Structures are given as C-alpha cells and as structure tokens.
Amino acid sequence: MELTTDIADFTRRDIELNGKTKPVLVTGSTGPAVIVMHEIYGFTPTVARFCRWVRDAGFRVYAPILFGEPTAENAEKLTIARQVSLCISREFTILFANKSSPVTDWLRALARLAHQECGGPGVGAIGMCVTGGFALSMAIEPVVLAPVLAQPGVPALSSAALDIAPDDLKHVVARTRQGLKLRGYRFEGDELCKAQRFSTLHQTFGEAFSGTELPDSAGNPAGFKAKGKPPHSVFTGDLIDAQGQPTRAAVDEVIAFFRGALR
C-alpha cells in the first residue's frame, strides 16, 4: 500500500470524554471498532497505512491524536521538545514503573464510545512504542477484548517493568483468567523495548500473553537501521510491505487476532 500524507479517507472528530476533548481520526463505516494509538512521532503516513489495513479487513478504526498534529504530515523524527513535553505532561507517565498514564482513563472512555457506535462483542486496541502499554491499561475496560502491545517502550527507566498501576494489573490478570488474550510484538535487538519487558509479560500473564519477537533482519533498511540502530517500529517505519516479509505477516496476524476476538 502506498504511503501518503493524504488522509481524505479519514474523518476528524473532536471527541469530549471525561471533560477533555481530543481529535480522533476515524476511517471505515462498518464492522467492530479498533483503536489505534500512534507512536511518539504522532500520526504519520505509516500509521495511516496500518489503520487502512485494519479498516480494509472490515473494522472501523479510531485513531486518537495524543500529541502532534491531527494530520499525517508528522515526521518520523524524535525531537527534544517532544521528549520533554511527554516527560512533564500530567497525562503521561513515561519514566517510572507501576503507574498507569492518566490519559488511559480517556482512552477507556473512547473504547466505550466506539463500542456503542459500532456494536459487536467488543473493541480492539493497539498501542505502539510510548503508547504500547496503553493497550494493557485499557484492558481493565470490559469492552476491550483484543489488546495488542507493539514494542512497548515505557517505562523508560526500567527495561523489565510495565507502565500500569498494580491494582489495574490485577484487574487485567483477573480478566485473562476469564479468557482474555493479549498479544505483543518487538524486534529481538530493540534497545527501547527490551526482552526483559516481554519476560515480565510472560511471567505475569502466562499463556494468555503471546509475544512475537522478530529477527532484526526483518526490519526495513530505511527505518531505524538507516540511523545505525536496531529496528523498533514493527508495524510502521521498520515494516517491509512485501509478501513473505515477517513484519507484513505480523500485520495479518494482528488482524486475525482482532477477527477472532471481535466477530
């Protein structure tokens, strides 16, 4: 699928929930809802492409804009200003472990709204990078039936820890005992989402968590590798959009996970 900054096939909605209004880009008119949370760069052409793949599989996609502009013109470039703003923001818990980011309260409300609008058994949710763990915190909401953690890179100061409050974590564990399944994705050499975090997820959730670790050789040469770093962004900048590529197969796997849980 071609990468483009043109998002005429998305509709911007300014949605007020819990007293806070955020722009949400919506695409698709039928099917169960899936919430796609962008990376630290904001909403980019590669995030829009992923949303379209999910939409074309028969889902209605809600992409909340948590930072950056509500367009696909955000560059896949991390700025010091963005890092500082996230670290001092009251909505995000970036550095420290065992805390749920306050913004996840709003995201759970969005999940409830999306479920009301779309119907079906429930809602899917995928977070990426700095938002990766948000899908885990969202899973305390009963309508969230298919949480996916893509290269969860937070908390930044502890490679094995999770960015979720202990009581929230207990709630998610209880849901897995009732049948909830979770999926996670990372590259083997990822320095931002290390293997220790997936080990914690396996230890915490057992067979309810399915973690896929892709070889670094599967990363796009034009992505993080071009900067001399191991690949990181499984479904966006480090994805190779070609048949037989492990990253493209991972997209199909996630879509199958959504179908299995939401239909």
Question: Can you name each region flagged by the protein language model?
Answer:
Residues 6-122:
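Serine-hydrolase catalytic machinery in alpha/beta-hydrolase-like enzymes
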Residues 108-164:
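Primarily recognizes the serine-hydrolase "nucleophile elbow" in alpha/beta-hydrolase
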Residues 208-263:
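C-terminal catalytic histidine-bearing segment of alpha/beta-hydrolase fold enzymes
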Residues 1-7, 27, 56, 236, ...:
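N-terminal targeting or regulatory segments adjacent to alpha/beta-hydrolase or S9 domains
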Residues 78-83, 165-167, 230:
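Short, hinge-like loop/turn segments at secondary-structure boundaries
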Residues 62-64, 150, 185:
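The conserved SAM/SAH-binding core of class I Rossmann-like methyltransferase domains
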Residues 155-217:
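The feature captures the conserved acid-bearing segment of alpha/beta-hydrolase catalytic domains
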Residues 55, 139, 202:
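Gly/Ala-rich phosphate-binding loop of Rossmann-like dinucleotide-binding domains
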